[in-house]
């Protein structure tokens, strides 16, 4: 070993040994549910809605942000009273955006509400830890005596609308402390029919600090005249792109859709190749076509290239509504596609050649980049966990959350005792090898007898720990014996951390001196190094292997990392005088 290699080994040990805790998930140390927080009201929501987390985001400091529908009576978040702004006479339902710190301490929350049921699709965080939500308020109420429940974001913003001049979709930004920054409403005031019937908001993502917002829009002019939808259809799918400051970049149309239909739709962008994906599931036997191609069966996965051109469509084989539901998608650097969902049992349905032998089990699946080949798929082998779920890719593994029950809940080679027979269900966290699909472990959140609980959202924080969110019916416990209790109604929402300790040390601290700053960290595709002089760089694995090196200037100051395996790296930056500084970075 030469002298430079010896120095690098010492440097890597110096920087990484103090952070051994955040490497524990990769070294086999036991993880468990370290803390649980909750919120909700004391009533049921209407139309089969539930108080349950459906979107989670985390930032560089491992603060947590969640979205959930909430009711009115005794509404609170972790004991902090909140106000519902809906009409109290008919199943009042609003949305809460809530934030908790790394150790679960309550930080702040916002109620987004008004008359009707809002659709706020997801919460996202940028590289500077600002927080964004996008979605649609429910009505054109103007705040008058006869329409006293206008859309609003607490006391930050009230939507000005009227039945003949209505605009419902919006994008809002807050800083990390919940301070309102701006709102964007790309649709010009239009008729209530256009705003309510033909305008929809779906998923919303931030990748490399660009905002991608998936919407359906009727013909008209949008984004202060920046683009026009001139389709002859009643509405067309678009992805709207924005900079972090709210300036509009462009709109890309994702083909055409025809028909008014009852379907569950979501959109995703693969950050590695820039392609767009749509999942849908019919809820009734309705007519639905994509680019003039009829959708015959109950569900499908659809792919568009980065210009919005339809590439392919993969359907299931059963026309019965609800026979296949896709909960979520994720992607790896090779553009393989991971799917979590449920499928009808008794082999009456098939998707990509995959079938199930018993009633509607949850499944996880891996397809190649073009969805021509099923690489692996599996479902649990005992009845449970249909109806709800979510999936996330985490390097060498896939994590899935849903629900489980019974004395011997089994998935692959793994089994756990959950509950006695017919004594309720618990939240499930299942982990799988992303290469082989083998089940690595099963975990449940302990609850009182008879409780009906489920996981409905999952993400990974900067330490590689999992955040699991969902709904619970009675009382649930973390591994330290702390519990949260349902206020009343069918469910309250919860957020829980699965880790080796309540707040693992940061694995993605942004290194900053007077001259250097690295962002985003963690990164998927590109690391940007903010410097004021020319420098050299070297990028090492945690075992000391040099994987990249080169020069950076104040103009050309980015490092491509999209081809690297997910995990932790040591970035060394050296100036022309030979002074070197080392920075920990995380590749997502």
Model-derived segments and their meaning:
Residues 1-35, 508, 512, 521, ...:
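Bacterial Sec-dependent N-terminal signal peptides
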Residues 6, 11-15, 21-25, 43, ...:
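Intrinsic-disorder/low-complexity peptide segments enriched for small residues
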Residues 18, 129, 335, 397, ...:
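Short, intrinsically disordered/low-complexity patches at protein termini
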Residues 511-519, 523-588:
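C-terminal outer-membrane/trafficking sorting elements
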């Amino acid at each position: 070993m030469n002298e430079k290699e010896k120095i690098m080994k010492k440097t890597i040990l110096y920087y990484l040994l103090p952070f051994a805790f955040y490497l524990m998930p990769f070294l086999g140390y036991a993880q468990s549910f370290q803390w649980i927080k909750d919120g909700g009201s004391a009533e049921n929501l209407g139309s089969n809605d539930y108080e349950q987390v459906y979107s989670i985001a985390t930032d560089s400091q491992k603060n947590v942000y969640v979205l959930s529908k909430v009711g009115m009576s005794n509404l609170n978040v972790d004991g902090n009273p909140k106000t519902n702004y809906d009409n109290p006479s008919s199943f009042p339902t609003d949305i809460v955006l809530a934030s908790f710190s790394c150790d679960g301490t309550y930080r702040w929350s916002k109620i987004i509400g008004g008359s009707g049921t809002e659709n706020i699709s997801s919460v996202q965080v940028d590289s500077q830890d600002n927080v964004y939500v996008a979605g649609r308020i429910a009505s054109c109420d103007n705040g008058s005596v006869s329409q006293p429940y206008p859309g609003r974001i607490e006391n930050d913003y009230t939507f000005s609308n009227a039945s003949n001049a209505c605009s419902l979709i919006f994008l809002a930004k807050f800083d990390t402390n919940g301070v309102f920054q701006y709102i964007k409403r790309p649709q010009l005031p239009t008729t209530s029919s256009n705003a309510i019937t033909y305008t929809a908001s779906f998923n919303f993502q931030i990748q490399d600090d660009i905002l991608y917002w998936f919407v359906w829009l009727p013909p008209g002019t949008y984004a202060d005249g920046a683009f026009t939808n001139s389709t002859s259809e009643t509405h067309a799918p678009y992805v709207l792109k924005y900079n972090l400051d709210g300036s509009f970049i462009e709109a890309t149309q994702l083909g055409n859709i025809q028909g008014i239909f009852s379907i569950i739709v979501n959109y995703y962008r693969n950050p590695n190749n820039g392609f767009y994906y749509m999942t849908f599931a019919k809820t009734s036997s309705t007519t639905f076509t994509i680019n003039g191609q009829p959708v015959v069966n109950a569900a499908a996965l659809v792919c568009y290239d980065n210009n919005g051109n339809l590439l392919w469509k993969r359907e299931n084989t059963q026309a019965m509504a609800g026979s296949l539901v896709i909960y979520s998608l994720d992607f790896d650097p090779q553009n393989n596609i991971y799917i979590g969902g449920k499928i009808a049992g008794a082999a009456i349905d098939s998707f990509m050649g995959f079938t199930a032998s018993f009633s509607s089990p949850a499944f996880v699946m891996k397809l190649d980049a073009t969805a021509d080949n099923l690489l692996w798929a599996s479902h649990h082998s005992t009845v449970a966990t249909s109806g709800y779920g979510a999936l996330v890719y985490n390097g060498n593994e896939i994590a899935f959350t849903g629900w489980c029950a019974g004395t011997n809940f089994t998935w692959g080679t793994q089994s756990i005792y959950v509950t006695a027979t017919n004594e309720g269900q618990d939240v499930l966290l299942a982990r799988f090898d992303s290469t082989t699909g083998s089940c690595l472990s099963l975990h449940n959140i302990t609850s009182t007898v008879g409780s009906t609980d489920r996981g409905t959202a999952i993400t990974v924080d900067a330490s590689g720990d999992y955040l699991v969110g969902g709904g619970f019916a009675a009382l649930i416990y973390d591994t330290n014996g702390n519990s949260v209790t349902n206020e009343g109604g069918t469910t309250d929402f919860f957020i829980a951390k699965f880790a080796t300790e309540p707040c693992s040390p940061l694995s993605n601290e942004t290194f900053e001196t007077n001259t250097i700053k690295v962002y985003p960290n963690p990164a998927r595709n590109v690391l940007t190094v903010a410097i004021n002089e020319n420098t050299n760089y070297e990028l090492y694995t945690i075992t000391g292997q040099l994987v990249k090196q080169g020069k950076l200037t104040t103009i050309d100051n980015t490092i491509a990392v999209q081809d690297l395996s997910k995990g932790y790296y040591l970035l060394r930056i050296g100036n022309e005088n030979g002074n070197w500084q080392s920075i920990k970075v995380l590749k997502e």
